[in-house]
A protein has these predicted regions:
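Conserved metal-phosphate-binding beta-hairpin within the catalytic cores
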Residues: 151, 160-162, 229-262, 271
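Active-site nucleotide/adenylate-binding loops and adjacent lid/helix of ATP-dependent enzymes
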Residues: 17-20, 63-148, 154-156, 166-167
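A short, polar/charged loop-to-alpha-helix boundary motif
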Residues: 184-185, 262-270
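Phosphate-binding site of ATP-dependent enzymes
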Residues: 127-216, 220-223, 246-251
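Short, flexible active-site recognition loops that position polar ligands and cofactors
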Residues: 267-279
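Peripheral (often C-terminal) accessory segments that flank ATP-dependent C-N-forming ligase machineries
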Residues: 95, 203-216, 231-237, 244-247, ...
Length: 300
């Protein structure tokens, strides 16, 4: 492959327009959003759509769906795919005095990715802590958008990766779980902001390991991921996060159609378990894109 890197967002639109005739397709590595604004993650594929340039990965509508966690929850429930019990809290809402499910609960931003706003403090055990954490998200993190409050699940913390485009041609990568065995026992078992971005945190010791599930549970999770992949219009690759409850029942947490590209990201970890290197996983995604757009069949 011969690549040209377009990483200057100030002139990105002009560069794409100027060089459009030379571009077979774009490998979209922009997982932090246009101008590094997370809410503008969908703007890059939207721009490519308007310029009629083919690109890898999901389209703007899919990215918009999945950026809204409550919307994904609603779609999953409509499809009879279980999700954690939860409620949606609007920006101005601090008047609630009870929850329709038991503590402990997990508080997280409804919009966003990269575990922004999800820390050890996000797992709370009573109403007083809950109100305090919500206030902190509003003030210290500057998060002014709706929140989700979900039951805190204590079972295996699971990730599933798919490369390709079901139902025609796809690969389900080995399922992994987070290994919390080295985490101090007084800390909640979550893979949040500290685990991904703070090397000095005890959460940095979390590892991802292969997960062996009962066949029925394994098949249900994979089938549900494939259904969601198609329903949400994911393309070429995607990651799905699940967690088991205390009875080992799987519950969908989130769908990430544009997971991070760092060398130690979850998609890369899954691929390594199947002997797929970092460069090979990129090649497989490129091949999935080429097959989808008919690059060679139609001489595009």
């Amino acid at each position: 492959y011969n690549f040209s890197f377009y990483d200057n967002h100030d002139v990105l639109i002009w560069d794409l327009m100027k060089n459009k005739i030379k571009i077979d397709y774009v490998f979209n590595l922009c997982d932090e959003g246009f101008n590094n604004e997370a809410r503008k993650e969908l703007h890059v594929p939207a721009l490519l759509e308007m310029l009629k340039i083919h690109y890898s990965g999901s389209g703007p509508q899919c990215l918009a769906y999945c950026y809204d966690k409550s919307l994904v929850r609603g779609i999953a429930k409509e499809m009879d795919i279980p999700v954690a019990d939860g409620i949606y809290i609007k920006q101005e809402d601090m008047s609630f005095t009870f929850l329709p499910f038991n503590f402990p609960v997990l508080v997280k931003p409804n919009f966003g990715d990269s575990s922004f706003g999800i820390t050890q403090k996000s797992v709370v055990k009573d109403m007083e802590e809950l109100i305090s954490v919500i206030s902190e998200l509003r003030s210290e993190f500057g998060y002014e958008y709706p929140l989700l409050i979900e039951e805190f699940l204590i079972g295996a913390d699971i990730s599933v990766g798919i490369i390709g485009n079901p139902p025609e041609s796809y690969k389900v990568l080995p399922i992994i779980e987070e290994d919390y065995s080295e985490l101090p026992k007084d800390l909640p078992k979550i893979c949040g902001y500290e685990a991904k971005w703070l090397p000095t945190s005890p959460y940095w010791k979390i590892k991802s390991i292969p997960l062996n599930l009962p066949e029925e549970t394994n098949n249900f999770i994979i089938e549900s991921c494939l259904k969601l992949f198609r329903r949400l219009e994911c393309r070429d690759y995607c990651r799905f996060d699940w967690r088991l409850d205390s009875n080992n029942n799987p519950k969908l947490l989130e769908v990430n159609p544009n997971p991070g590209w760092c060398w130690d990201g979850h998609l890369v970890k899954m691929a390594k378990l199947e002997g797929i290197s970092y460069s090979n996983i990129i090649e497989e995604i490129l091949k999935a894109t080429e097959n989808r757009i008919g690059l060679f069949q139609n001489n595009i």
